[in-house]
Each structure stands twice: as C-alpha cells, then as structure tokens.
C-alpha cells in the first residue's frame, strides 16, 4: 500500500528530559523518525522539552517547539499548527501518556487530528493492566495469576488467596516506576502505596511472582497489510525479577531450543496482530527453564530502549521503518537501508553475539540501595559485539567506564562464600562479577544455579573465562596462549598484570607476533548479501572487512554510556563534530559503544566502530585507519582521559594540545597560568596527605570546598564547614596520595556564572554567558541556568568577557572551552576552566544559532574564526529569556539524598523560553515535572544558618495566600516576625506529624535545607525522601525557592485592603 496522501502535516511528540528508564534511545529514535517522514515529503512538527538532543535541532523537523510536554502546551501547539496527525510512539512512555491525555481532553477530536502508528485502543490495551489481561485471556496466552487493584485493601485480599512473593506493576509508567517484588506485608504496604501514587490512573497489577524463569524479549514489526516480522530476539542473562533495563542482555538468544524459539516467536506475532499495532513493538516473555510453560509479561506498544538495542545489534533501523509504516508504507515496499538491495520484510540474521550491560549511578550515590528488582536504576548502557559470548561480554565490561578491564573487581576477592551467596540471590549491580569470583573460589555451577537460576550455559561461559585466566597466569610469555586469550576477549591490561609487564609491552609483543584484531561488518543478513554500511566490530580471525580508503580521515572519540555528569549533551557535540569533519572534506570515523545514541547510528559517520573506549581498542583502529589525528574534546572526560596515552603512542591530538589540556586540569599549573594572566581565583591549595589538608583548611578558613583533581560531574566534591567534616571526607570520599591530590578552596557564597567560548589560539568568540539561579556551591549541572544574564552589571559582564578572552589565548585553547566564574562582593573570580565541550553546548547552540561544536571542529581542522564569519568578542544577546532547568531521577533511587551540592545528581535537563524571566522559569519548572499550584500549604524546616533568609521567603509565600507550616524552632522565628504559621510536630512525634502531612498530600512544597550533625541530618533526609516518594516538590536550595516564588507572584493577583495600601504609601513618604 503506498504512503498516505490524505495527510500532510504530522506532529511528532518527543520523550522530554533524560530520566532513569527513558534515556538517549528516544533522541535516536525520534531523530530517525523525523528524517524518515520528511524523506516521504511530509511536513514534520516536533515538540520536545529537551534542549540537549539532536532531535530538537532546527534541521531535524520543519518546525521545532522546545516546550513543556504537558496538556496545556501541546494543546496550544495543536491549535496553532493544526496538524493532520500525531505520532506519539517514538516519544517513549511520555509520548504514549501524552497521546492518551490529548485524546481524553477532546482536543484531537476538536482539531480533527488522528493518532498514527499505534491506535489509542492498542495503547490502552497494552498499558492498562486490566485490558491487557483480558486480551491475553481472549488469545489463550498464559499470564501469571494476577489481579488489578486500586487500593491497598484489594492488594491484601489477593495476597491472602495466592501468598507471597508477588510482583507489583503500576499502569502507564515506565522503567518499572513504583513497582517491585513483595515478599512480606511490610514490603507490600510500601510498594503498593508507592505504585498507586506513581500510576496516573491509580491502578496496579498484582501478579504471582514468576521470578527465576528465563526472560526473553522479541522486537517485532507489523504493517497495515498484516505483514509481521521479528527483528531481533534477546535473552536476559538475569532471570525474571530484575527489570530488563537493569539486566545484562545478549542477542540473539543463546539457550532456546528451536521449538522454544518458534513457540515464543509465534506468540509475539500473534500479540502484535491482536493489538493491531502498525510499527514497532516489544514483547517480554518468561519461560520456565524446566518445561515448555511460558508466560507473557508485558508489551510495549512503541519504540523502546530494547528497540534501540535491537537496531544497533542488527543494523535494522526500527524507528526509521516504524515511521514509514505509520504513514501507510508496507514492509515489502521499503528497501532495507543497510543492504540497499533487500526489502525490510527480510528478518535480520546475526553471525555474531551482542552483549548489553547497564551502567548504574552507584559510583555517584554511595548510599543508594544497590539491589536490583523490577524498578529500573541504570542511567545508561553499553553494547559490544564479538564472535563468541566470552569475547562480547569482556568487551562490554571494559566499555563501562569504571576503570575495570576484566570480569573481576579487587574488593570482591575478600568475600566469603556466605556473603557471595546472599548477594547472588538478592541481585545487585555486581552480580556477574560475584559469580566469576565464586567460580574462582571453587563454588560449583550447580550451587550458583540453585542460588539465582542463571542458566548453566551462561555459567559455563563465565567458567571458561576463569579457566582461561589460569592458563594465562601459568604460561607467561606463551604467544599461543595469548592468541587464545585474545580470541576470548581478554584485554592487554589483564594480561600485562598477569605477566608482570606494562600494557604497552603486551601491545608490542602482539604486533611482533601478528596477533591483531580484524574488523567485521554489521550487515543484517549474516553476509548473505553484500552490504553497504560501514559499521564494524573487532574480533580475532582471518579476514578484515574494514578497508582503509585513500581519503584523509579524522577519528572522533565518543563519550560512552550515559551517566550522571556525562549525558546526551556530549553525544550531541560528537555528532555535530562528525558532520563538520565531513563538511570539511575529511572522512569522519567515530568510536563509541553506546547503543542508545545518535552518534552510533551508522548513517551519521563515514565509518562507525562499535568498540570499547580503552587505549588498546582505540589504538587498533588508529593502526588500521592511520588518521590525520584524533579529536578528544567532544567525548567528555572519557575521551580527555585517553589523550595522554594516545600521545605516548605517537598519535596526534587535534585541537588544544595535551600540554595545554594539562595546564587547565593540573592545579598548580592552572594557578600559575592565572597568576601570570592576572585573573583572580578563590584562595586554594593542593593536599597530598590528610595532615596537609587539615593545615590548609585552617590557613584558608572554613567553609572550604574539597575535591579530587581531574573529575567530571563534581564526583566526590563537598563543602566542609569544620574539621570533623573534613576528616570524615578524607577518610570516606577520597584516597589521597601524591598521584591523586585533593584540592582545597575557600568557598565563596556568590553568584555563579558560566561561559562557553570557542578559541582558535588568536581569536576568542563567546556565544553566550549564563547566570545560575543557585549560588556557587550547587553543581552547575544541577543549577537552573538563565540566558541572557538578568542581574549582571555591564561592568561585571565586561570583566567576564575580558577574562574569557585572556584565558582562551593564555591557555592556547584551540576549540571549545567552558569557564565557571563566581561573582563575590562585586569581583569576578575564576572557579574552573574546562578545555572541552561542556553540557551547555547544545543549549547555547540552539538559543544563539551558533553551531558551537561545528565551528569548534572547523577551528580544530585549521579554519580560523574570522574565516568562518566570527571574530573575537561576545555574540549579541537574544531578546527572549531562556531557562535550563535540571531534572532528577530520585523517585527511582531509594535512599539517595536529594540535597543539592557540589556533586552532580541530575540525569537530564529541559528548556523554558519566553519574553520574561518569570514565564520562562514557569515553563522550565513545569517541563521538569514540578507542579506549581497558585495556592496551598508550604512546610518550612531549615538549618539555623538559613533561618534569617527563610523569613523573607516565608513572608512572600504568606503574601500570595499560602498556608505556612513549620516545626517549633522555625515556627518561633516566624512568629517573632509576625508571620502567621501553623506549628506541626517533628517527625519523631508519636502524634500526627510532618511526615503524615506529606504522605496525605496536604503540602504543595517542602522547603528543607541541610542541617549537619547526626540526628537532624537523619530527620532532614527522611523529610526529603518522603517528599520524593509522595511526589511533593522538595526544595533544598533557597535560591531555587526564590525562583519559584517569582513565578508564583507573577501568576497571582495581589489582594491588599485599602488601609494596607495607604499605610504603605505613607511609609514610603517618610522614607523619602
């Protein structure tokens, strides 16, 4: 059936900010879909709130709206643009929920808009647990015995009937939000209460736990002619019970017999047909390892995290084809873009093994509960490809960016058998490493299988790796053993340690003995047809399929998995850099390992290598390609950290030299440079011992800011107010020694300013200056940023511009630089300089229209700023106000403190833009998920040091009609200022207390600042967590609170009696 001609304009709904459960995979799928629809001649309008993505570039769609994804704003866009149809299935759960909300509000009917891809009835049948259960029963498809509940009482009734354990799955949520496995009444009460709150329809499915079954996923496609295919099937190494986003996954499935494979394939196709989905769909199934009994777990009637993985694993571009199917094209009409010969109705075939390992944020959140269950906790993932499972797994392990090069962790060697058993049964982020350790210590595969029901096939593969370790250790210098180890995926780093040599020595030994990898192509058809895609993975074998061309080439290093501190912003910069390299006439080669991102779409670069970002893996590519050089500026800290080792190997680092990178990162060299340039900075020194640290802090004076050198995302940074806190930090947060010094700075309570600039060594161009709402001390990634600055005097702005130009030239920067300043007592100080792309590059590029990564790349390749039409100086400011607001995933991470500080905690960001600061803030806050009601109650419990400041805030809340609630201490201070307040009991009170108010939804805001000391700190933590669990906005910075007040005040009409007005006027006369 040819494409539809009765529709012209299509509104695509994006997925909004990156949160746990919904990450960069939707930037990839959304970008693909918009391009795919435009190829077919449709006018595409995009709405998304996330400025950090390629998807929200103006070139992606005919019109791009960066606006909150709420009913209010999307309805406005529909009324203004009058699209013929909307496509919500590429915007993740956000897109689906938005479609349902729009349909129910009546706007779609009012404006004559139809839903493409997945019909509303199919969305509801798949997402509403009750309707889905009914459909499965009609199809005679087995599902675990279950019930739908809307109250806690109903949950208790069901458990009486079938007993524990039970799984709770809230309706219309993603990433398992609010769900979990309950083994007793206490867990049931906690998880069901939370699940009902998180479900927008207050509905949960309670089902008998089938934990321990194999978890299998099928990624299926169907068109309007009822052609349906399986694109890829995947198997979770972790059995049912761990969310698939937190599971280690392999593709294709490894342990299914043909009968099992066909049985589950038929079920998946039967389900997509019954739902009538036109496009992509993900079916999750559980299979009893001891029989042919299977269960349908759930269906995602949309493009998902798994479809991004399936696309990259097979090369089959699911989102691109799903968009074409949505407008009426059929699988037998669409050419497969990979082979450019076969049609899209051919099911992909794989002649390799793909492994995906999640990347968790536990290195950031030491206190988080690491146990894995049905609620997702990973922020991102890595993927690797190999010719055997061992090779594929070990390549994935070293892609994780945890400084780990093998399936072993030093700290696990101390574990006794009982501890290992507990952790393997319970499942946490280190389970696979613990399984390997258990096998090293002689625990049998049978015992491990009994503990966690992991399939013997996977346990055998881990045992093969452990046996190979023994071979390597027993045969030092044996090249045959080395060849076998490399075929199994062992790294030079591991072999070097086992043979007591350096990594470089092993590398040289291999080259001499000709033990080097070859590169194979990902072609969707197991080499049955000739393929046109330059998409490669390394393995050890005979024939190399990646042929070097005669063109000059440049290698760009990507940023690896999405994690806190290094998000999709760096992928954005990487993609723009690749485009600029191509425009400049070079061959662009990209190395990256993140299956979710646009940069690993094979159509972006001239060559894509899906490989770990380690020195060994990158050097193999450089040895083959012999590029002009490597660009490390756009891959975040991942790429910067490889610069020195690459240079040791004789590789040319393009852009800012290694020496100058080091001058910006090394504390003493940086201080010397600033002194030479005459630029002030907060007093600070470097400590290499605990005693030194104590002496420096005494000399500078508390409070001080302490942090390790060379970090991204403020890892292990803290503001310390007295010596006990400093000693606690030195003992727990860092291992200080000569090679890893700790930086100690005077902490200045001032306004923080952030600047991004581009330098060619001679000229320095500044696209934008941003002002942070939160004062210095809150990480820049967690602050609300405002452009253009709203409260900077011209004099201060000039100082900032002068310092930026001096730093760009003085540090010999070639490419991008990001500078953070603090304004303290009308003086500008430099806090830090990052000689690389920062997380604000996409935001400022979109606002100013200066394609920063593109311009910087051309500078790096030798085209100076003047040639490109830019010179030295500050880009004219825009008239509108733009706000960048952070988005957090605290609801997914139990026991993480939500207090903001110098350590970054946000996972994503949104943008709000309008004519005034208040309106832009309103949009930014609403887009980030903060509800802003014009009236209600606010709970105020603040630290003593903040009481004075909190008085003015409380007064303003009272002025606009808010009811104030406070515990005794704060209430007394308020009463002394004649501010009406209602006293509430502290949380340790047996009577109705502060936590009860939060749980019952009787407060709209909670203002709580961090109090140091044991009990108050614990109380504050419980108040903050309770707020998150109950969806109440908890404000831990008084600056953020002031910003929200500005918005509330701008929305509220004043209500003063005439007497108050005349008194105010009389008061003014007296003062005059």
UniProtKB/Swiss-Prot annotation:
Positions of ATP 1 binding: 129, 169, 175-176, 208, 210, 215, 241-243, 284, 298
Domain notes: The large subunit is composed of 2 ATP-grasp domains that are involved in binding the 2 ATP molecules needed for carbamoyl phosphate synthesis. The N-terminal ATP-grasp domain (referred to as the carboxyphosphate synthetic component) catalyzes the ATP-dependent phosphorylation of hydrogencarbonate to carboxyphosphate and the subsequent nucleophilic attack by ammonia to form a carbamate intermediate.
Organism from which the protein derives: Bacillus cereus (strain G9842)
Amino-acid positions noted as binding Mn(2+) 4 in the UniProt annotation, renumbered to this chain: 832, 834
Binding positions for ATP 2 per the UniProt entry: 707, 746, 752, 777-780, 820, 832
UniProt protein name: Carbamoyl phosphate synthase large chain
Residues involved in Mn(2+) 2 binding: 298, 300
CDD domains noted in UniProt: MGS_CPS_II
Keyword set, alphabetical order: Amino-acid biosynthesis, Arginine biosynthesis, ATP-binding, Ligase, Magnesium, Manganese, Metal-binding, Nucleotide-binding, Pyrimidine biosynthesis, Repeat
Cofactor: Mg(2+); Mn(2+)
